[in-house]
């Protein structure tokens, strides 16, 4: 449960928000690392296929975490007063909104790309994900290119987000980073 401390103390987010934030961060970075790693491997090799399979399975996990995160944020998560005002608040709100939008788009593109390949895909080998929409195989390259572009955009925005957190912590010393590191 989140609390708002008085005076110079910081606001602390609820545990669920913190868990969803860091789980999302680790999944996004991990998915990106898997994709970038397999791009250096020859097509059709067992290692490349394993990395792609892991990317798909963790991508499905990411989709579930993202949906749960949005539900949590809308229904249960504690809203705190903004840590900044003026242009910092506008920038923070804009980057957060854009990250959410891009993550939703990336998830949709991931499904579309797999469906365009016309091959079944599984969640850690436990079950196959059904094809819900028939996608023309010819659109695969276009969708794959968008998936790659959105991935890089998310990584760049996430890096800016992390740098902003460090700026708040070391320059402004306003407790913003500590709000996402601990819950009381």
Task: Indicate residue ranges for each PLM-predicted region.
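Membrane-helix interface/capping segments
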Residues: 68-88
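Alpha-helical transmembrane segments
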Residues: 51-65, 150, 155
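Membrane-interface helix termini and inter-helical loops of multi-pass transporters
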Residues: 39-49
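Alpha-helical transmembrane segments of multi-pass membrane proteins
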Residues: 28-39
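Single conserved hydrophobic/aromatic residue that forms the stacking wall/gate
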Residues: 1-12
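Hydrophobic alpha-helical membrane-insertion segments
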Residues: 95-115
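Juxtamembrane non-transmembrane "cap" segments at the membrane-aqueous interface
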Residues: 111-132
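Hydrophobic alpha-helical transmembrane segments
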Residues: 136-157
């Amino acid at each position: 449960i989140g609390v708002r401390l008085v005076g110079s103390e910081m606001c602390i987010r609820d545990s669920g928000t913190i868990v969803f934030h860091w789980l999302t961060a680790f999944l996004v970075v991990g998915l990106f690392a898997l994709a970038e790693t397999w791009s250096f491997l020859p097509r059709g090799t067992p290692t490349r296929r394993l990395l792609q399979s892991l990317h798909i399975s963790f991508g499905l996990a990411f989709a579930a975490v993202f949906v749960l995160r949005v539900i949590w944020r809308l229904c249960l998560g504690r809203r705190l007063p903004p840590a900044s005002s003026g242009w910092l608040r506008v920038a923070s709100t804009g980057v957060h909104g854009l990250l959410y939008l891009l993550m939703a788009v990336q998830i949709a593109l991931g499904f579309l790309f797999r469906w365009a390949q016309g091959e079944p895909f599984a969640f850690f080998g436990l079950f196959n994900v059904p094809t819900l929409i028939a996608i023309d195989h010819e659109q695969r390259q276009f969708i794959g290119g968008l998936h790659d572009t959105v991935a890089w955009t998310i990584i760049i925005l996430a890096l800016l987000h992390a740098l902003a957190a460090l700026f708040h912590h070391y320059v402004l010393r306003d407790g913003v980073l500590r709000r996402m590191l601990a819950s009381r």
